[in-house]
């Protein structure tokens, strides 16, 4: 398995630093021992800079989402207003084919001028070209063995170009991303 990568300013960069186990241990202590596998899996793909840029409350929300997505909630969307319409949007959601395109398209259509992004997945590197049917078979096998679904944790920064209040804009964005995630979770391929 290759080294994890994250996307920053359009360049895939290797993640050479790791999240300290003490952070994972603190999060598991708050969520319960049954969360250890899901939390460790999610945080194993994050760079320490991603973690350092996140507040303790945000880290707890991401850890909780690692346990709850998609069984209890379709996805977690966190929008933080930085200044003068600049926002940071962080998404924890199930991993599925073409998700990056769907998310960035929705962000753009919602009025976010994306300036940078970090993209992480617990799925590891793609095994090469797979058909949609192959992906569905792999998911069915994972489901039958009880293996947790792969997750993404993506962070985008940019400027909201609509005239809407940021809180109103964020509420609409959260609902739209949840709707898209619910549609993908149905896993109904076209033409079958």
Model-based region annotation:
Residues 1-192:
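Non-catalytic interaction/regulatory segments
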């Amino acid at each position: 398995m290759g080294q994890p990568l994250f996307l920053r300013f359009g360049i895939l960069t290797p993640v050479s630093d790791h999240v300290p186990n003490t952070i994972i241990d603190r999060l598991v202590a708050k969520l319960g021992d049954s969360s250890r596998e899901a939390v460790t899996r999610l945080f194993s793909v994050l760079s320490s800079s991603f973690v350092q840029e996140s507040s303790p409350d945000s880290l707890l929300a991401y850890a909780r989402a690692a346990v709850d997505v998609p069984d209890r909630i379709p996805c977690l969307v966190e929008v933080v207003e930085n200044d003068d319409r600049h926002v940071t949007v962080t998404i924890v959601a199930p991993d599925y084919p073409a998700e990056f395109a769907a998310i960035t398209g929705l962000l753009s259509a919602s009025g976010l001028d994306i300036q940078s992004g970090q993209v992480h997945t617990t799925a590891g590197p793609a095994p090469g070209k797979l058909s949609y049917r192959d992906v569905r078979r792999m998911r069915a096998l994972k489901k039958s063995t009880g293996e947790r679904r792969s997750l993404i944790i993506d962070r985008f920064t940019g400027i909201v170009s609509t005239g809407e209040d940021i809180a109103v804009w964020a509420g609409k964005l959260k609902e739209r991303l949840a709707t898209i995630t619910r549609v993908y979770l149905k896993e109904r391929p076209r033409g079958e």
